[in-house]
Amino acid sequence: MVLESIARVIKVQLPAYLKRLPIPDSIAGFIRLTVSEWLRLLPFLGVLALLGYLAIRPFLPKKKQQKDSLINLKIQKENPKVVNEINIEDLHLAKAAYCRCWRSKTFPVCDGSHNKHNELTGDNVGPLILKKKEV
């Protein structure tokens, strides 16, 4: 039953539909088409456009995919939440930079790894900088 229906569509209904389409003999004939004729052509042209897109899609450039979707790739993965506590009195330097990108090999201190991460992903992450206030 299903195959008979498909055969009927392909052998009878599709050719009849294509014969009724107002396809002009020349390109200039498209200018003379009326609005109702354009509306009758619309489904056919839509199917042609879809088939054309599907045919050229493998040759279109791929979108740049993000290298990794996780933020923290390797630091303290055994913990459900990574927390680093730093006592303010322990800041001996006038300025300290702490990592926010999770790529630093000296985590929690920033080593500039965010620069490579930003280039690869288009992100704009930077370090957390703590400075002593001048009195």
UniProtKB/Swiss-Prot annotation:
Keyword set includes Iron: yes
Family: Belongs to the CISD protein family. CISD2 subfamily.
Cofactor section: [2Fe-2S] cluster
GO biological process per UniProt: autophagy of mitochondrion; regulation of autophagy
Cofactor binding annotation: Binds 1 [2Fe-2S] cluster.
Topological domains annotated Cytoplasmic: 61-135
Species of the source: Xenopus tropicalis
The protein's name: CDGSH iron-sulfur domain-containing protein 2
Function recorded in the entry: Regulator of autophagy that contributes to antagonize becn1-mediated cellular autophagy at the endoplasmic reticulum. Participates in the interaction of bcl2 with becn1 and is required for bcl2-mediated depression of endoplasmic reticulum Ca(2+) stores during autophagy.
Binding, [2Fe-2S] cluster: C99, C101, C110, H114
Pfam families: MitoNEET_N, zf-CDGSH
Main location: endoplasmic reticulum
Lumenal side: 1-37
